[in-house]
């Protein structure tokens, strides 16, 4: 399965099985298209993993509970963990999660709420600055036609024609780096 993280990857928070499940979820939420642009290529799993170890650490228990419930459901109903299921069956499981009744094992918040959380984080991972672990190679920004981080635009650039640049700027180009607290820090300034 191409969307699963490779052994020895830069995962820091989730277990290998949890990461496989998140990667499979993200791949169904934002699947790869004919151009090869989707959650797997954009590295969404690495954004989610990094965020759960930093700015979103309070959500880690919810993820652990939800991922365990999802794998337990897959094993009980389809004899495989979620990540190992055929994509069509994965889609059926996601549709069941979306219903009001949902699927069991997700605690008080339910499977629908958990799925919405993962959808939100998948979107963030697709379109965040690459410094946060997702949007690898600025694929998400390229998909949207977003020109990237810029110091400023001239009045002429803001009028009429779309802004087209060969290089899509990132926070790294502006001397910013990722901070585990979830905030960008300017290198060498303490800001």
Enumerate the language-model features and the residues they cover.
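Immediate post-signal-peptide N-terminus of mature secreted/exported proteins
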Residues: 2-39
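Mature-region segments of soluble proteins
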Residues: 5-7, 18-24, 43-191
């Amino acid at each position: 399965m191409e969307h699963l993280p490779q052994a020895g990857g830069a995962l820091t928070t989730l277990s290998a099985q949890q990461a496989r499940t998140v990667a499979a979820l993200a791949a169904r939420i934002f699947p790869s298209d004919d151009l090869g642009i989707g959650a797997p290529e954009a590295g969404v799993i690495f954004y989610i993993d990094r965020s759960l170890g930093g700015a979103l650490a309070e959500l880690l228990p919810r993820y652990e509970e939800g991922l365990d419930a999802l794998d337990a459901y897959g094993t009980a109903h389809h004899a495989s963990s979620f990540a190992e299921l055929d994509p069509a069956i994965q889609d059926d499981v996601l549709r069941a999660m979306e219903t009001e009744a949902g699927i069991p094992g997700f605690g008080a918040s339910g499977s629908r709420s958990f799925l919405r959380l993962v959808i939100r984080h998948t979107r963030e991972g697709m379109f965040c600055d690459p410094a946060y672990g997702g949007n690898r190679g600025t694929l998400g920004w390229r998909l949207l036609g977003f020109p990237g981080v810029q110091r400023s635009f001239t009045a002429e650039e803001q009028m009429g024609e779309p802004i087209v640049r060969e290089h899509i700027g990132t926070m790294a180009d502006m001397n910013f780096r990722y901070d585990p607290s979830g905030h960008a820090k300017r290198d060498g300034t303490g800001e």
